Amino acid sequence: MKKVTIRDFIKKKSMKEKITMLTAYDYPTAKIISNTTLDSILVGDSLGMVVLGYTNTLNVTMRDMISHTRAVARANPPQLIVSDMPFLSYEIDVKSAVKNAGLLVKAGSDAVKLEGGEEIKDIIRAIVKAGIPVMGHIGLTPQRFLRLGGFRTIGKTKQEEEQLIKDSLELEDAGVFSIVIENTYVDIAKRITEKLNVPTICIGAGPYCDGQVLVIHDLLGLSEVTPYFAKSYVNLKEIISSAINQYIIDVKTNKFPEKQHYKERES
C-alpha cells in the first residue's frame, strides 16, 4: 500500500469512496494498522481518556501528543497520520499555534486537527500557510465541553444548526483538507457534506459523510463505556481477562513455564 496523502482524501470524495480512520496511540497498534488498508490514523487527544485515565481531554499536553505521535510514526505506516492539537496549544495566539503544529509534524505527523469553528479560521489559515495540512473538527468538540454544557448532541436548535453550516464553510475557506463532524444529527451532517468540496469524516453523525472515524478502544471492546455511536467488533477486554486468569492458574499449578520456555545446562 502506497502512502496516503491529503490529495487521496479529496480524490476519494470525488469518487464517492468512503474514507476510513481509526485512532492509534502507540507503536504496536500502529504496526498492526500498517498492514491493513485503513486510510488514516488519528493520534487523538482522546488518549487522555482511553490511555491516561483522565475524565476528559483537557489535561492532555503537547508533550503527550508529541510522544504518542512519535510512537505511531516509528511504525512507518502508509496511512495518513493526523495528530490532534491539544487544549490551549493553538487558542492563545497564532504564533504559538503554528509552532506547536510544526512540532507535531516534526514528531512524524502528516497533518494536524483543530477543534472549533469560525473563531479559529485565522489560526487555521496561518498553519496552512506555513505548509502544514489541517483537518477541522466541528459539532461536539470535546475540548469545549465545559462551554457546551457537557458531552451532548449539537444542532438541536436552528441557531446551532446554522452555526454548524457556517463553521464548515468558514473552515473550508480557511484551507482545511477535511472536517470531522462529531455527534450531530444525521440530516445536518448530510447537508454539510453536500455543501463542501472537502471530505467530511463522521463520528456519531450518520452514514452520509465521506468517511468514518472511531476510537480503536471502542472498536476492540476495550473501553469502560462504549458511546452509543461506536461499534465494538470484538470483546478484547474479555479475551485479555481470560488470558490473564489462565496465566495465574498455570503459574500456581506449575503448568507455566514449560520446558520450551527455559534452558537447562547440558550434563
Swiss-Prot record:
Record-linked InterPro entries: Pantoate_hydroxy_MeTrfase (IPR003700), Pyrv/PenolPyrv_kinase-like_dom (IPR015813), Pyrv_kinase-like_dom_sf (IPR040442)
Name of the gene this protein is made from: panB
Pfam family for this entry, one: Pantoate_transf
Function: Catalyzes the reversible reaction in which hydroxymethyl group from 5,10-methylenetetrahydrofolate is transferred onto alpha-ketoisovalerate to form ketopantoate.
The keyword Magnesium is annotated on this UniProt entry: yes
Cofactor stoichiometry and binding remark: Binds 1 Mg(2+) ion per subunit.
Listed pathway(s): Cofactor biosynthesis; coenzyme A biosynthesis
Active site, UniProt feature: 182
Designated name of the protein: 3-methyl-2-oxobutanoate hydroxymethyltransferase
Keyword Transferase: yes
One biological process term in Gene Ontology: pantothenate biosynthetic process
Cofactor: Mg(2+)
Family: Belongs to the PanB family.
EC number: 2.1.2.11
Catalysis performed (reactions): 3-methyl-2-oxobutanoate + (6R)-5,10-methylene-5,6,7,8-tetrahydrofolate + H2O = 2-dehydropantoate + (6S)-5,6,7,8-tetrahydrofolate
Subcellular location: Cytoplasm
Entries under CDD domains matching the protein: KPHMT-like
